[in-house]
Amino acid sequence: QRIVADEPDVLIYPDVGMDPLVQQLAPLRLAPVQCSGAGHPVTTGLPNVDYFLGSDLMETDNAQANYTETLVRLPNLGISPASDALPALQACHPPGALEGRSRAGVIFLCAQDPRRMMPGHDYLFARILQGVPDAERWFIASTREDVTRAFRRRLSRTCESYGVDSDSRCVILPRLASVEFGWVIHEVDLVLDTSFWSGCSTTFESLHRGTPVMTLPADSMRGRRSFAILRHLGLDELVAGTEKEYVSLAIRLATDRDFYAARLAEIDGIRDRLSGDESVIRALEDFLDRSLTGDV
């Protein structure tokens, strides 16, 4: 009722599908022009959502086929995140689950919810650990305990088939507060992105804190967000083209000190480009003006 009373010209839902209330509002026609942002990186499938505000770098040439909305390809990453929203490193601290644990020689992190990890990719985790004997792989528990338990069983079976002891080399951390997550991101040596449903805000934070992220892009936008961020920043050496390359790249970053140091230097040189892309804001303004006159 409040929205209807305000009579908005344009209504933008940043992430349809992430909040139950928004999920109830989005099917309604509450404004002449209604848009979905890419906070939830899939089509809404709703006839009253007219446009999907996407990213030119994240989408493939035929991406419109993935949307019921008209896809609006905003320049570059389609977003302009604010790095000052992250907690200062000085305020970050390790999670209690890591107290008293000796540091491994190399620490890989997979920062996504296990629900985003496809069973067919579990072998990649095992092969990487097999190739770096002094490495650990850290994961973060799902918001659902049953998913975490199932993932742990999956991981154990797959690692065992590759001769890797998952109990000693795979750590599943509990859900983390932002100050704990900030410490973890800074502490690990490399973030291994998930291909089917890649990171976005986690990738921005990792690079902001100076930690490399490597990825294997998928075909749809939800699996191409880290790829687009790395491509936009010129960090192409951190992008794998195949699953075999994904494994070999992770092993090289963990074992080739010069190659790893070069990636750290590249990240240090581009951190000021992680936020403040005014071209995205100007393009969104232009699109909204044109959408109200039907000139889109």
Residue spans for each PLM region:
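Conserved catalytic-core segment of nucleotide-activated headgroup transferases in glycan assembly
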Residues: 76-177, 290
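Active-site-proximal region of nucleotide-activated glycan assembly enzymes
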Residues: 29-93
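Catalytic binding pocket for nucleotide-activated donors in carbohydrate/polymer assembly enzymes
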Residues: 185-186, 190, 194-275
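A donor-sugar binding/catalytic signature common to diverse glycosyltransferases
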Residues: 10-31, 35-46, 178-226
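C-terminal amphipathic helix plus adjacent low-complexity
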Residues: 112-114, 141-143, 150-158, 248-296
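Short, well-structured alpha-helical segments in soluble
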Residues: 1-7
